[in-house]
UniProtKB/Swiss-Prot annotation:
GO terms for biological process: fatty acid biosynthetic process. Transfers the 4'-phosphopantetheine moiety from coenzyme A to a Ser of acyl-carrier-protein. Keywords: Cytoplasm, Fatty acid biosynthesis, Fatty acid metabolism, Lipid biosynthesis, Lipid metabolism, Magnesium, Metal-binding, Transferase. The keyword Cytoplasm applies. Belongs to the P-Pant transferase superfamily. AcpS family. NCBIfam families: acpS, pantethn_trn. It catalyses: apo-[ACP] + CoA = holo-[ACP] + adenosine 3',5'-bisphosphate + H(+). This is Holo-[acyl-carrier-protein] synthase. It is an enzyme of class 2 (transferase). Its main location: cytoplasm. It comes from Methylobacterium nodulans (strain LMG 21967 / CNCM I-2342 / ORS 2060).
Length: 132
C-alpha cells in the first residue's frame, strides 16, 4: 500500500546562485558527504545538486512533515543501488518519521525518480508499505 507521495520542482538557476553565493556553506548544510562527492565529480554540478535537492523536498512531503518535526536536510540521502537506480537512505528524524508512518507488520520501501530539463529539476517520491 502507498503511505506517502511527494513531488518537487527545483529551479537549477536557483541552485547555481546558491552554489556561487554560499559555496560549501550551502552544500554542507543540505547535502551529505556522499551526495557532495557525487555531484562535485560532474562537469555540470548545479543540475546534479538540484535533482538531489528536489528529491529531499519530495521525500519530506511524502513523509508528511515537510522540513519540520525533526526532519533535516541531511537525514535524507540520494544513493544509487548497484543497478544504478536512485533511492533514498533515511537517517535521524526522517528515519523516525518513516517508522512512525509505517503500519505494524509492514516494511517501508522508498521509490524515487529524478530528472532535469533545464532550467528545472524534478523528483517524485513514493513510499510503499509491504507486508512482512
Amino acid at each position: 500500500m502507498i503511505i506517502g507521495i511527494g513531488s518537487d520542482l527545483c529551479d537549477i538557476r536557483r541552485i547555481t546562485r546558491s552554489l556561487e553565493r554560499f559555496g560549501d556553506r550551502f552544500t554542507h548544510r543540505v547535502f551529505t558527504e556522499g551526495e557532495r562527492a557525487r555531484s562535485d565529480r560532474r562537469a555540470a554540478r548545479a543540475p546534479s545538486y538540484a535533482r538531489r535537492f528536489a528529491a529531499k523536498e519530495a521525500c519530506a512531503k511524502a513523509l508528511g512533515t515537510g522540513m519540520a518535526q525533526g526532519v533535516f536536510w541531511r537525514d535524507m540521502e540520494v544513493v544509487n543501488l548497484p543497478s544504478g537506480r536512485p533511492t533514498l537512505r533515511l537517517t535521524g528524524g526522517a528515519a523516525a518519521q518513516l517508522a512512525a508512518i509505517t503500519p505494524a507488520g509492514h516494511r517501508a520501501l522508498v521509490h524515487v525518480t529524478l530528472t532535469d530539463d533545464p532550467p528545472l529539476a524534478q523528483a517524485f517520491v513514493v513510499i510503499e508499505a509491504l507486508p512482512e
